[in-house]
Curated annotation (Swiss-Prot):
InterPro entries: Ser_palmitoyltrfase_ssu-like (IPR024512), SPT_small_subunit (IPR051900). Component of the serine palmitoyltransferase (SPT) complex, which is composed of SPTLC1, SPTLC2 or SPTLC3 and SPTSSA or SPTSSB. The heterodimer consisting of SPTLC1 and SPTLC2/SPTLC3 forms the catalytic core of the enzyme, while SPTSSA or SPTSSB subunits determine substrate specificity. SPT also interacts with ORMDL proteins, especially ORMDL3, which negatively regulate SPT activity in the presence of ceramides. Interacts with MBOAT7; the interaction plays a role in MBOAT7 localization to mitochondria-associated membranes. It comes from the Eukaryota. Belongs to the SPTSS family. SPTSSA subfamily. Disulfide bonds: none annotated. Residues 27-31 are lumenal. It comes from Bos taurus. Residues 1-9, 55-68 are cytoplasmic. Pathway: Lipid metabolism; sphingolipid metabolism. GO terms for molecular function: serine C-palmitoyltransferase activity. The record marks 25 as: Within the serine palmitoyltransferase (SPT) complex, defines the length of the acyl chain-binding pocket, determining the acyl-CoA substrate preference. This is Serine palmitoyltransferase small subunit A.
Length: 68
């Protein structure tokens, strides 16, 4: 019962995603290309934030002399 409800909820979120991004008008292969590009861009942004954010935070803390 809970699995069916979760599946219905995820289907609703996916439907909303298709409507908001206007992907419902595209063919399946175009939708796949768009989603692949979106996932890769978000993945690269998260990776870049993970790699470089600690360096920037430490530079800010040193600049404001919070950390010596």
């Amino acid at each position: 019962m809970a699995l069916a409800r979760a599946w219905k909820q995820m289907s609703w979120f996916y439907y909303q995603y298709l409507l908001v991004t206007a992907l419902y008008m595209l063919e399946p292969w175009e939708r796949t290309v768009f989603n692949s590009m979106l996932v890769s861009i978000v993945g690269m942004a998260l990776y870049t934030g993970y790699v470089f954010m600690p360096q920037h935070i430490m530079a800010i803390l040193h600049y404001f002399e919070i950390v010596q």
